[in-house]
Amino acid sequence: MKSYLLVSMLLLLNSILVYIYTKNVQILVSGITVAVIIYIVVKIIFERFVHQ
């Protein structure tokens, strides 16, 4: 498993757990958004510059 995928999944899991305990939807939405942004940006950078 690639490290950026692992970081995105852990961040997503963390935001879900925080949502379960706080019932704050804003934390859940921001966590999902950040996880998706990290995954997409790092994947693009990794594929474009590392795998040439």
From Swiss-Prot:
Keyword field contains Transport: yes
Keyword Ribonucleoprotein in annotation: no
Domain of life: Archaea
Induction profile: Up-regulated upon UV stress.
Ranges annotated as spanning the membrane: 1-21, 27-47
Bilayer topology: Multi-pass membrane protein
GO cellular component, one term: plasma membrane
Keywords: Cell membrane, Membrane, Transmembrane, Transmembrane helix, Transport
Subcellular localization(s) per the UniProt record: Cell membrane
Role summary: Part of the Ced system, which is involved in DNA import.
Entries under NCBIfam families matching the protein: Ced_CedA2 (NF041798)
Self-association and partners: Forms a complex composed of CedA, CedA1 and CedA2.
Protein's name in the database: DNA import protein CedA2
